[in-house]
Amino acid sequence: MPADSMEKPTASPIAGAPANSAQTPDKPKSASEHRKSSKPIMEKRRRARINESLGQLKTLILDALKKDSSRHSKLEKADILEMTVKHLRNLQRVQMTAALTADPSVLGKYRAGFNECMNEVTRFLSTCEGVNTEVRTRLLGHLSSCLGQIVAMNYQQPPSSQQPVHVQLPSSTPVPMPCKVNPAEAISPKVFQGGFQLVPATDGQFAFLIPNPAYTSSPGPVIPLYANATSPGGPPSQSPVQGLTSFAHKMPHMAQAVSPLGGSTRADSAESVWRPW
């Protein structure tokens, strides 16, 4: 074959390309890099969910309060949340009133729970040294005032399986003494050592009164307690009145909180106590 008829070999563009230009698979991103890259997207979605929920909440709360939405078109997020909280509190009060009317035992549970919380606050303040005396006195005075309002509420007759026991809050130094009383045996007034008096009533109820020299003209608030009623032939029911904490050496004129139920009775009780907070 003639030499001039032979084609000269030409360099291939692919063959002449450098080796590092070959396509390589991308490296997988680490977890931290993935979170960093997806954080703006997640933040955008979160804000969208919040705004959507607030918009729905605004519509619901304005309809519930029967307000014109055109006049409240520029409500801030804080205003919407505050209006919702107030509305839910009002609903809670209405539901509590309806429950008190339908179930007479609800008020007793509420009183017992409030008194239990007040007793815990009193016990803490009597042992805590860092609390100012003025603040302590004001706080316990406010709780005593609230307790008096709760006691003044209308209370229906509890079921026959329970007998209410009324305990008067003392302001002088009380003497912790457990009391075991059988309602069937409470026929006449009995006076115990220390001036404690048991006064029966005609309807089967009885009151356990503690002497209160500082408030002889105006008796203190009375808290109902409950003990399981038993038949005259059965064993006497026990209603220990315990937890009489006293710090009269610091505040002699403050009312003391009385635990509505003893420790063993509280542990064995099948019904839970509703706490107001």
Swiss-Prot record:
Residues 110-143 form the Orange domain. Residues 34-91 form the bHLH domain. Residues 1-44, 258-277 are annotated as: Disordered. CDD domains: bHLH-O_HES1_4. It comes from the Eukaryota. Residues 26-35 have a biased composition (Basic and acidic residues). Its main location: nucleus. Keywords: Developmental protein, Differentiation, DNA-binding, Myogenesis, Neurogenesis, Notch signaling pathway, Nucleus, Repressor, Transcription, Transcription regulation. GO terms for biological process: floor plate development; lens development in camera-type eye; muscle organ development; negative regulation of apoptotic process; negative regulation of DNA-templated transcription; negative regulation of skeletal muscle tissue development; negative regulation of transcription by RNA polymerase II; neural crest formation. The keyword Repressor applies. It is found in: Nucleus. Dynamically expressed in the borders of several tissue territories. Expressed in the pre-placodal ectoderm (PPE) from gastrula stage. During gastrulation, expressed in the deep layer of the dorsal lip, the Spemann organizer and three distinct regions in the prospective neuroectoderm: neural plate border, presumptive floor plate/notoplate and anterior neural plate. Transcription repression requires formation of a complex with a corepressor protein of the Groucho/TLE family. Interacts with the bHLH protein hes6; this interaction may inhibit the transcriptional repressor activity. Binds DNA in the form of a heterodimer with the bHLH protein hey1/hrt1. Interacts (via Orange domain) with id3 (via HLH domain). PANTHER family: BASIC HELIX-LOOP-HELIX TRANSCRIPTION FACTOR, HES-RELATED. This is Transcription factor HES-4-B. It comes from Xenopus laevis. The lineage of its organism: Eukaryota, Metazoa, Chordata, Craniata, Vertebrata.
